[in-house]
Amino acid sequence: MPFEEPTKQDVQMSLGYGEQKHPVTGEPFFHHGIDFSVNHYLLSAVATGTVSAIGSDAEHGIYQTIRYGKYEVTYRHLSNVFANFSQSVKAGQTIAISGDLLHMEVRFDGEEINPLEFLTMLYGNIKALEHNSQMGINELDMN
């Protein structure tokens, strides 16, 4: 996961990707990411990448986008960022801290994808790296 789990308890996804009912208004809408119930968790880069955007807007507060090869991951509802625009980051490097929740969006080659697909791919790559490190191979290709 891109965040530390300080209590070693499972982190709950509070809102999934796709067609949803707004948690406050009850109105149907398309949710372009996933939300996690986290409170000021440290966020880490999931691979070597570059900060491609940082900003703030009224709806999502502070946000940061990291480009990992053909993947672009945007984290919203942040309380602070530690990696600056155009800065290179390495896997495991602390890049930001979440606010009361974390909203995550993912694009592959410019096309929006379900962030759970990205996280599932990451988990598979981590398992492969663990296996490969036993064989002396230490590369992760995000392209």
PLM features per residue range, with description:
Residues 1-62, 90-91, 128, 133-143:
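Surface-exposed, glycine-biased beta-strand/turn segments
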Residues 13, 62-67, 85-142:
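Conserved, short, structured surface segments that act as functional micro-motifs
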Residues 16-18, 39, 69, 78, ...:
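Generic beta-structure capping elements
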Residues 29, 45-82, 100-106:
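Zn2+-dependent peptidoglycan hydrolase active-site motif and core
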Residues 40, 79-86:
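Gly/Ser-rich catalytic serine loop of serine hydrolases
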